[in-house]
């Protein structure tokens, strides 16, 4: 990241480093060891089995309600009406984001991920930078509130990330904020694509689809 081209637009702005570039250079997925190893260890330490298991009843209820809505409407779009709604709620629950605040999350994630396209347009770049800035501004408020009023560390991953420490090491404020953005982006695209690709695969392999339908518990 110190190579000359990275010191020029679109990686920099008149005010300094562009928000997208700052996000990617501080995000877990775009760094190598030893930084990657250290940050990964601290994040995984916050994602306890108990916290994950505590989300299961709410996730089952969410999936049932989304499917019920599609059935009531007489059909729907698998991605728009089902798959894309799941990761936003999961990450929202992990970080204990109030439900009233969750509407912008998907748009921010899509814009930030869209800015990774190889043929990036100026409009995509501007939207990606703006989305990083808006998301970080929201997270700063959320983290400040959680510092004053911590959640239950057994279930609130954000509180664990804030309070977490291993061998005297903890996430810096920048690492905390940027990797909360990463958690949303990482869970959003992968989960949505997995559900969509799984449906396509089941359509292309009817024998496997029939096997699944006769033994749903095996799924």
Residue ranges and their predicted role:
Residues 1-219:
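Cytochrome P450
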């Amino acid at each position: 990241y110190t190579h000359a081209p990275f010191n020029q637009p679109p990686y920099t702005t008149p005010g300094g480093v562009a928000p997208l570039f700052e996000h990617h250079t501080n995000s877990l997925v775009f760094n190598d060891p030893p930084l990657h190893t250290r940050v990964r260890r601290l994040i995984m330490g916050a994602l306890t089995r108990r916290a994950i298991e505590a989300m299961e009843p709410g996730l089952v209820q969410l999936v049932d309600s989304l499917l019920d809505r599609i059935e009531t409407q007489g059909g729907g779009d698998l991605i728009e009406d089902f798959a894309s709604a799941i990761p936003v709620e999961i990450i929202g629950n992990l970080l204990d984001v109030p439900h009233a605040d969750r509407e912008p999350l998907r748009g921010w994630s899509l814009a930030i991920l869209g800015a990774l396209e190889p043929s990036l347009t100026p409009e995509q770049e501007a939207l990606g930078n703006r989305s990083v800035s808006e998301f970080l501004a929201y997270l700063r408020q959320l983290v400040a509130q959680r510092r004053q009023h911590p959640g239950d560390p057994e279930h609130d991953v954000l509180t664990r990330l804030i309070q977490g420490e291993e061998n005297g090491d903890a996430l810096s404020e920048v690492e905390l904020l940027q990797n909360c953005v990463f958690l949303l982006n990482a869970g959003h695209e992968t989960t949505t694509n997995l559900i969509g690709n799984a449906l396509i695969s089941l359509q292309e392999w009817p024998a496997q689809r029939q096997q699944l339908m006769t033994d749903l518990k095996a799924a």
